[in-house]
Amino acid sequence: GGNGGLFADGGVGGAGGATDAGTGGAGGSGGNGGLFGAGGTGGPGGFGIFGGGAGGDGGSGGLFGAGGTGGSGGTSIINVGGNGGAGGDAGMLSLGAAGGAGGSGGSSPDGGGGAGGIGGDGGTLFGSGGAGGVGGLGFDAGGAGGAGGKAGLLIGAGGAG
């Protein structure tokens, strides 16, 4: 997704393409927010018989903006579901704006689940960390959950794993 203007949010990343013969395409990254804008959401990974596509990362927030959410990983049938995208970091001076949540991992009924994306970090001083993404449902093994993002130095909670 494209970067936002001064007060605008970043654009949403495009979805990864699906395939019935291989691995799904990766989702596009979300654009970075303008000075007061939030980061855009990452696009979801595409469906693939032999592996789900990875979700796109969320864009970073502008100086005062929140981070964008990571895209979810694509679903797979035979192999592993796609990993969720990482959440974008919040802007340095964002008051109460959190890092973006990590995307959830893709599922696979005959393979392993994809890992959840890590949460974005809160603003350098004041923001809370974003939550880590949920691991995907799998037949062989479930996907690992993503780690939560770090909080700002002065105020803010760490993100949940």
PLM regions and their residue ranges:
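Long, compositionally biased tandem-repeat segments
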Residues: 1-161
